[in-house]
Amino acid sequence: MRYDSPLAAVGNTPLVRLPRLSPSADVRIWAKLEDRNPTGSVKDRPALHMIEQAEKDGRLTPGCTILEPTSGNTGISLAMAAKLKGYRIVCVMPENTSQERRDLLAMWGAEIISSPAAGGSNTAVRVAKELSAEHPDWVMLYQYGNPDNAGAHYATTGPEILADLPSVTHFVAGLGTTGTLMGVGRYLREHKPDVKIVAAEPRYDDLVYGLRNLDEGFVPELYDASVLTTRFSVGSADAVTRTRELLQQEGIFAGVSTGAALHAAIGVGRKAVKAEETADIVFVVADGGWKYLSTGVYTAATTEEAIERLQGQLWA
């Protein structure tokens, strides 16, 4: 398919059935391959949508500086769009993010301000808000509270899923900013009320890379509990195990947060098998694994070794 710009190539990603990881012939798991977006992650959708809506609203004009707290993917997506549209961008990142993410941000011209590792992305948000107060002419799009984050998925991801798989019964995504869950969830619920919306959420006081537990003190402003059917608890070992299985059994090379979503999808699928139900379960492959090669998680001999290698790194 032909496009005039990488920005025009955002979205319309493949939906792929996973025959080896699906629990049964009647309970099928489908992967929405968001790693096929131009910068390799689902965040291309909200990044572009937030910028374009800010332009329409007159908040973002030529010569403006974009400010965003991020631990990687959203910043990378915003940096790519900012580069093409001619904006300066400043990203506040926790100091313990993977080197690949820092290199990618710098490659697209982003200026990086490091926030303390303690507190992770929550601390990055605080630092960014302080910078915003100091520089009122900077435009902080703020993915955690910007309705255009969820709006991107309501306008694109949700319709794509329903068009490709009218029989969809469940939608599963990792719980981060909650933009994907809120946007897709609202769209699917409006057009197919029986669809179940499932959030893959880390266990309390456990680190699942790329996700957050809502009970640990920071609830994104976008979050609306009424959109979800359930929150599925996932441990770090579960996420790493499923990430490695996805590569080894289905050939999909994804980031660790995707493993958490897959674990929840498999759990939902097993319940459907036990209840003798038919199900088509869609989960989001949020990004590709190539951004995390330096961690060694994919080449470790065992899951335990992979988890040990990940200690101290932030992937949100």
Question: What residues fall within each predicted segment?
Answer:
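PLP-dependent amino-acid enzyme catalytic core
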Residues: 1-316
